[in-house]
């Protein structure tokens, strides 16, 4: 009998949601993760500074941890590379990394909802079997295997088939038969045959075994709740609304759930049953009761657990349907979200002030909300300082305390206050290393940069310990001297040295500092990375292709030496004055310039030229190969083969889209046609004229 029963239900026909609706949430989906102090809008990721731009779930978790006086449980950085070095994150990163979930929990996030508890249920079942002395050992092994086979029903597979390897006749003891009956009921449950599951669990709900008795009562209520929701869930597992729920079945589920809790107020499944009661409140549209329950959850229970995260996402998902009056944490999170820049329904100052009554027991949180409004909406930075006193010298910071002081630091920075450096330095003494310290270091670094003291970031014994912060400054702010020093600083990680050297050589080459390039290119190590396909997306945590300056591609038809030799030729001609636009360029210079253009093209340097990698000069001041070619075309001193190649290349700049991919001043199609006619006519015998059949 059991064999046919198992095969009958072994294929899971649909992913019915135990939680009742799809996870819409408010998780940020943008890939834009910028590590920055201010966070005014959803366009960026979240950080440990509670702010309007954070995912509302992150803010809710931070405030929950603050209420419980707990720091974030973060033994290490999450693996977010290349998204801003782990200091900012998506909500999904919080779930998988900050909470430090184990392998079982990671699987739990991606399991059909009614199968979520399978592994935990298996452990409970196996333990109950093992301690039941009335079951022979030989039968226990059969019962363990029977439970294990049920797991196939929760596997993702289009076609799953198996056979039950043991005959039911192998279980002869009374207690063993009771556990086998539980397995049969569970098979109906995992096979989504809800009425049959309820019937089978009911038959064993008065079992003499204490675990079967409790588990069966719990499973009756759980199955009834799922059955009541079936009519409100479409084929894709999307919840269609409470109105489509079977209210009669829902009432039965509520009676069963309350009966379980009455008999087991501190049972194995009490926490889960309380969660199901919240689901019943939702399905019955009892939002006042649900609001009260969520207020209790956010203030009194730890949301940084597996069950807590489920509750947190549930709270966030339903926030628009619930009253905001009770529970200052949830109200605060919603108010912060209404401060986001660009939102059409941004909260007004009058509306914010009208909420004061709800924060009578939490003045620090309310003044923090007022300070956020002053900073992000009103841009009244002095008001922020009035609302948040200086407490930078604390020995430690809970999430709200840290966020308050970080906001004060941002206001000081916005005012360019003389005290800002001292403030950030004081905060360093009390912050945690993993998440809080990088925020404070960023504030301090920003001040150094503003005061033209960027060397403070890189000097020996610097207060700035964070590698990512140093790399961002190498990429976007460091001058030639800092870049050269860091490229040779053996106390730094290889990634920092490679980045410093790459930016140094790139800037030298594209700004015409050829003599310096020849000298510094000797610093490129052997076998350095040359993979440059994603060079346009170069970020601090990218794998740096510094090897292109030593072992890059020099030529694909036009003969060119290494880029160091080419740069040496350009440096020599520059010293002779042949780079002066008013002087004729000699043949050596023309060839070197064409080879520089080929280096740009073959190593994807073109893709970088519009990036702003430093304050001086701007990208518009970089030397573009489009300009190389047009200048050489118009120079009568350039020999015919080089001029033909310049024509060939400048026309190809517009292939295939008609847009200029070479930089420099773009020309219209008529000009490109004239170039093509010139190449095909005057230089028609050249290799380059023969290879080009179109213009764009």
Residue ranges of model-derived segments:
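Bacterial N-terminal signal peptides
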Residues: 7-17
């Amino acid at each position: 009998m059991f064999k046919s029963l198992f095969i009958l239900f072994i294929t899971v026909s649909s992913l019915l949601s135990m939680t009742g609706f799809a996870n819409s949430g408010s998780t940020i989906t943008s890939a834009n993760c910028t590590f920055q102090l201010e966070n005014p809008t959803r366009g960026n990721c979240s950080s440990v500074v509670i702010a309007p731009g954070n995912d509302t779930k992150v803010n809710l978790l931070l405030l929950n941890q603050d209420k419980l006086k707990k720091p974030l449980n973060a033994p290490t950085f999450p693996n977010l590379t290349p998204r801003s070095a782990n200091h900012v994150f998506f909500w999904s990163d919080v779930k998988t990394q900050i909470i430090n979930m184990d392998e079982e929990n990671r699987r739990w996030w991606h399991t059909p909802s009614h199968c979520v508890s399978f592994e935990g249920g298996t452990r409970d079942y196996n333990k109950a079997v093992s301690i039941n002395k009335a079951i022979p050992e030989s039968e226990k092994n059969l019962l363990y295997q029977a439970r294990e086979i049920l797991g196939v029903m929760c596997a993702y597979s289009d076609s799953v088939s198996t056979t039950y390897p043991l005959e039911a006749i192998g279980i002869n003891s009374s207690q063993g038969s009771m556990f086998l009956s539980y397995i049969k009921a569970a098979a109906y449950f995992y096979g989504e045959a809800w009425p049959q599951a309820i019937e089978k669990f009911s038959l064993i709900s008065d079992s003499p075994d204490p675990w079967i008795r409790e588990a069966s009562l719990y499973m009756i209520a759980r199955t009834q709740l799922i059955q009541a929701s079936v009519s409100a869930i479409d084929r894709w597992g999307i919840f269609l609304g409470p109105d489509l729920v079977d209210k009669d079945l829902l009432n039965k589920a509520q009676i069963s759930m309350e009966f379980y809790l009455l008999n087991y107020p501190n049972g194995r499944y009490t926490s889960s049953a309380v969660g199901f009661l919240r689901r019943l409140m939702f399905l019955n549209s009892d939002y006042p009761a649900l609001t009260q329950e969520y207020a209790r959850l956010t203030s009194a229970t730890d949301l940084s657990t597996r069950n807590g995260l489920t509750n947190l996402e549930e709270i966030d998902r339903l926030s628009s349907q619930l009253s905001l009056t009770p529970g200052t944490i949830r109200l605060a999170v919603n108010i912060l979200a209404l401060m986001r820049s660009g939102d059409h329904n941004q909260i007004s100052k009058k509306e914010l002030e009208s909420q004061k009554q709800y924060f009578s027991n939490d003045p620090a949180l309310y003044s923090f909300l007022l300070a956020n409004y002053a900073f992000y909406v009103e841009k009244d930075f002095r008001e922020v300082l009035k609302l948040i006193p200086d407490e930078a010298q604390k020995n430690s910071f809970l999430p709200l305390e840290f966020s308050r002081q970080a906001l004060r630091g941002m206001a000081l920075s916005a005012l360019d206050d003389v005290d800002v450096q001292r403030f950030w330095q004081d905060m360093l003494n009390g912050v945690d290393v993993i998440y809080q310290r990088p925020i404070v270091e960023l504030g301090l670094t920003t001040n150094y940069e503003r005061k033209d003291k960027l060397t403070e970031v890189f000097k020996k014994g610097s207060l700035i310990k964070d590698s990512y912060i140093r790399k961002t400054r190498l990429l976007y702010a460091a001058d030639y001297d800092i870049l050269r020093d860091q490229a040779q600083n053996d106390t730094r990680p290889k990634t920092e040295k490679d980045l410093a050297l790459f930016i140094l050589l790139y800037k030298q080459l594209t700004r015409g500092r050829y003599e310096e390039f020849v000298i510094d290119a000797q610093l490129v190590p052997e076998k350095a990375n040359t993979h440059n396909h994603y060079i346009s997306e170069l970020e601090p945590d990218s794998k740096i292709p510094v090897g292109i300056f030593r072992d890059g591609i020099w030529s694909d038809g036009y003969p060119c030496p290494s880029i160091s030799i080419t740069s040496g030729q350009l440096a020599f001609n520059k010293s002779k004055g042949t780079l002066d636009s008013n002087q004729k360029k000699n043949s050596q210079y023309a060839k070197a310039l064409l080879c520089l253009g080929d280096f740009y093209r073959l190593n994807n340097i073109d893709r970088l030229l519009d990036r702003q990698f430093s304050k001086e000069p701007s990208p518009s001041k970089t030397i573009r190969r489009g300009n190389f070619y047009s200048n050489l075309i118009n120079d009568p001193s350039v020999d015919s083969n080089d001029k033909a190649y310049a024509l060939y290349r400048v026309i190809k700049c517009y292939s295939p889209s008609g847009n200029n991919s070479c930089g420099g001043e773009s020309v219209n199609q008529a000009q490109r046609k004239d170039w093509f006619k010139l190449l095909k006519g005057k230089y028609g015998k050249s290799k380059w004229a023969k290879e080009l059949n179109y213009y764009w």
